[in-house]
Amino acid sequence: MTTESLETLVEQLSGLTVLELSQLKKMLEEKWDVTAAAPVVAVAGAAAAGDAPASAEPTEFAVILEDVPADKKIGVLKVVREVTGLALKEAKEMTEGLPKTVKEKTSKSDAEDTVKKLQEAGAKAVAKGL
């Protein structure tokens, strides 16, 4: 590939939404038969060596949208758009076919704030440590 075609590719990827990037990641993992997960051996090795406490609290969290009552869907949709920056179509897709991950690799306070906003809008949401 030429430098120009690589720059074009970078520009196209930069225009994707978070949901589209997530779908692209899944498609590439399937196509290349790989996963983008961190190796488990490295984590287990550090814990076995005593470098990390066994009961260490996670520093990164994911916010999971578990349920949206039909009568609360519009309010929840607005909150999803607010916290993710997604367009209306992508936010609507995120509120269907639950559970869905609304945010990944976020701080504990941000995850708690996001869960609180979703719950205030009427959704059932939880923050899970990664």
From Swiss-Prot:
<protein>
    <recommendedName>
        <fullName>Large ribosomal subunit protein bL12</fullName>
    </recommendedName>
</protein>
<dbReference type="Pfam" id="PF16320">
    <property type="entry name" value="Ribosomal_L12_N"/>
</dbReference>
<dbReference type="InterPro" id="IPR013823">
    <property type="entry name" value="Ribosomal_bL12_C"/>
</dbReference>
<dbReference type="GO" id="GO:0003729">
    <property type="term" value="F:mRNA binding"/>
</dbReference>
<comment type="similarity">
    <text>Belongs to the bacterial ribosomal protein bL12 family.</text>
</comment>
<comment type="subunit">
    <text>Homodimer. Part of the ribosomal stalk of the 50S ribosomal subunit. Forms a multimeric L10(L12)X complex, where L10 forms an elongated spine to which 2 to 4 L12 dimers bind in a sequential fashion. Binds GTP-bound translation factors.</text>
</comment>
<keyword id="KW-0687">Ribonucleoprotein</keyword>
<dbReference type="GO" id="GO:0006412">
    <property type="term" value="P:translation"/>
</dbReference>
<dbReference type="Pfam" id="PF00542">
    <property type="entry name" value="Ribosomal_L12"/>
</dbReference>
<dbReference type="GO" id="GO:0003735">
    <property type="term" value="F:structural constituent of ribosome"/>
</dbReference>
<dbReference type="GO" id="GO:0022625">
    <property type="term" value="C:cytosolic large ribosomal subunit"/>
</dbReference>
<dbReference type="InterPro" id="IPR014719">
    <property type="entry name" value="Ribosomal_bL12_C/ClpS-like"/>
</dbReference>
<comment type="function">
    <text>Forms part of the ribosomal stalk which helps the ribosome interact with GTP-bound translation factors. Is thus essential for accurate translation.</text>
</comment>
<dbReference type="InterPro" id="IPR008932">
    <property type="entry name" value="Ribosomal_bL12_oligo"/>
</dbReference>
<dbReference type="InterPro" id="IPR036235">
    <property type="entry name" value="Ribosomal_bL12_oligo_N_sf"/>
</dbReference>
<keyword id="KW-0689">Ribosomal protein</keyword>
<dbReference type="InterPro" id="IPR000206">
    <property type="entry name" value="Ribosomal_bL12"/>
</dbReference>
